[in-house]
């Protein structure tokens, strides 16, 4: 990763470098310049989530794109995967998403999709980053008669809803199915309720009144307490929790228990395998996936590949290895037969299809995978030296791995978006897992905290 781009685009506190108006302006210019073609005016989709800072960044990107001769198309508030879909379906040259996903409202971010609906590669982002940082974009602007014009597209919601509904098998019906939904006061606040209502669900929606500063606030995929309680109160079949930009899903079963992304992978993988649609019998997960996923894959005859953390790396390995299903424990799930990126609403639709096809409640399907106790501790760090160059940390990891044997595992890695080191330990019990996780975290903190 470079100076600006992390594992999921550019992130930072809004109205502060690098997530300020001058930077957004420069990114708009750089993307337009890189994508410029002979006799073709670059067309770029711009969408956002519900953060108050989205207006500023949207305007700055628009100015940068038009100043470099491109035509921006504004779609307003739309989930990240919706922007990827619109970019590809409109044959635009790129799509820019203004969002910081599950982060609090103070943060914002910029991520970019290519014209094919896939996120840009590291190499493409590096070219854009170098243009932004060399300070010479002003020398590359066209004359006034070649400046671009902004447009607004008003029917994107309907287009995206039709796409989502078409992924639900026609022989199935959600008619009368009780569903509770938490949109995190985020980008799914309109499209998710409308999609499920049109599919016939009996819907109860919470945390669905965005005001610019309540996105992800004690709600959504990171905070399912309210959703779990409401599902039980309403006697619902399932609860659906999206994050701020709508690219991930955490589900809740009818008993009010949380279902992770790993469990969703196993449930949907078994459904696809039963239909002969799980290409190469392969699931792509990440190194952070629960050990229970590996055990379940062996039990049901799936092959499993662990990618680096980040949905972009999951996708890259899916394409390289020929897989149609992959994802992360956090709820990013990619159905490559349907979409180019993780989509929380699409994932919810597929999960409900698996429930209806099996005739089983979600609590029973969740038992397809035994979840190993897992503890994650995040440590703020001043720098990010290679873990292998820290002998005391390496030794601490070896000691714990030796103690756990085949009853658990250890992972120490840096965050791709924050100055943070993550220590994850899985083991046979909560007590042992917490003990060993704290043991390693203390060593990491002493070394680089």
From Swiss-Prot:
GO annotation, cellular component aspect: cytosol
Domain of life from the UniProt record: Bacteria
Annotated signal peptide: none
Cystine connections: none
Reactions mediated catalytically: alpha-D-glucosamine 1-phosphate = D-glucosamine 6-phosphate
GO molecular function: magnesium ion binding; phosphoglucosamine mutase activity; phosphomannomutase activity
Cofactor requirement: Mg(2+)
Pfam families, per the entry: PGM_PMM_I (PF02878), PGM_PMM_II (PF02879), PGM_PMM_III (PF02880), PGM_PMM_IV (PF00408)
Residues bearing PTM Phosphoserine: 101
GO biological process, one term: UDP-N-acetylglucosamine biosynthetic process
Claim: Isomerase is one of the keywords in the record: yes
Binding site for Mg(2+): 101, 243, 245, 247
Active site positions, chain numbering: 101
Enzyme nomenclature, EC number: 5.4.2.10
Keywords tagged on the record: Isomerase, Magnesium, Metal-binding, Phosphoprotein
InterPro entries linked to this entry: A-D-PHexomutase_a/b/a-I, A-D-PHexomutase_a/b/a-I/II/III, A-D-PHexomutase_a/b/a-II, A-D-PHexomutase_a/b/a-III, A-D-PHexomutase_C, A-D-PHexomutase_C_sf, A-D-PHexomutase_CS, Alpha-D-phosphohexomutase_SF
Cofactor descriptive note: Binds 1 Mg(2+) ion per subunit.
Post-translational modification: Activated by phosphorylation.
NCBIfam families: glmM, PRK10887.1
Task of the protein: Catalyzes the conversion of glucosamine-6-phosphate to glucosamine-1-phosphate.
PANTHER family: PHOSPHOGLUCOMUTASE (ALPHA-D-GLUCOSE-1,6-BISPHOSPHATE-DEPENDENT) (PTHR42946:SF1), PHOSPHOHEXOSE MUTASE (PTHR42946)
Family from the record: Belongs to the phosphohexose mutase family.
Name of the protein in question: Phosphoglucosamine mutase
Organism: Syntrophobacter fumaroxidans (strain DSM 10017 / MPOB)
């Amino acid at each position: 990763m470079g100076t600006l781009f992390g594992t999921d685009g550019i992130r930072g506190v809004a109205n502060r470098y690098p997530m300020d108006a001058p930077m957004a302006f420069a990114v708009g210019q750089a993307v337009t310049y890189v994508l410029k073609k002979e006799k073709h005016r670059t067309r770029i989709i711009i969408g956002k989530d519900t953060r108050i800072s989205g207006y500023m960044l949207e305007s700055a990107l628009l100015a940068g794109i038009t100043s470099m001769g491109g035509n921006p198309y504004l779609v307003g508030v739309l989930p990240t995967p919706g922007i990827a879909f619109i970019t590809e379906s409109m044959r635009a040259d790129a799509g820019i998403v203004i969002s910081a996903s599950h982060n609090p409202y103070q943060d914002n971010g910029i991520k970019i999709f290519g014209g094919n609906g896939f996120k840009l590669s590291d190499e493409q982002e590096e070219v854009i980053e170098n243009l932004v940082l060399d300070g010479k974009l002003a020398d590359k602007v066209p004359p006034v008669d070649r400046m671009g014009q902004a447009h607004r597209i008003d029917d994107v919601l309907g287009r995206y809803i039709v796409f989502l509904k078409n992924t639900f098998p026609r022989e199935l019906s959600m008619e009368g199915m009780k569903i509770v939904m938490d949109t995190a006061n985020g980008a799914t606040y309109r499209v998710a309720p409308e999609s499920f209502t049109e599919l016939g669900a009996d819907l109860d929606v919470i945390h669905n009144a965005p005001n610019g500063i309540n996105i992800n606030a004690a709600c959504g995929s990171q905070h399912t307490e309210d959703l779990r309680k409401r599902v039980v109160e309403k006697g619902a079949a399932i609860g659906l929790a999206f994050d701020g930009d709508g690219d991930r899903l955490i589900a809740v079963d009818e008993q009010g228990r949380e279902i992770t992304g790993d469990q969703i992978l196993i449930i949907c993988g078994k459904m696809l395998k039963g239909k002969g649609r799980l290409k190469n019998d392969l699931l792509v997960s990440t190194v952070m996936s629960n050990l229970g996923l590996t055990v379940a894959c062996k039990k049901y005859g799936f092959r499993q590949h662990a990618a680096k953390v980040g949905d972009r790396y999951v996708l890259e390995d899916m394409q390289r290895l020929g897989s149609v299903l992959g994802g992360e424990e956090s709820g990013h799930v990619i159905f490559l037969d349907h979409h180019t990126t993780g989509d929380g609403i699409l994932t919810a639709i597929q999960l409900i299809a698996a429930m209806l096809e099996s005739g089983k409640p979600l609590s029973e399907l969740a038992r397809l995978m035994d979840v190993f106790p897992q503890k994650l501790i995040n440590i703020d760090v001043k720098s990010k030296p290679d873990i292998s160059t820290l002998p005391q940390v390496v030794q601490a990891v070896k000691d714990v791995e030796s103690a756990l044997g085949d009853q658990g595992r250890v992972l120490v890695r840096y965050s791709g978006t924050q100055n943070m080191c993550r220590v994850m330990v899985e083991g046979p019990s909560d007590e042992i897992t917490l003990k060993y996780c704290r043991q390693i975290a203390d060593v990491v903190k002493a070394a680089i905290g």
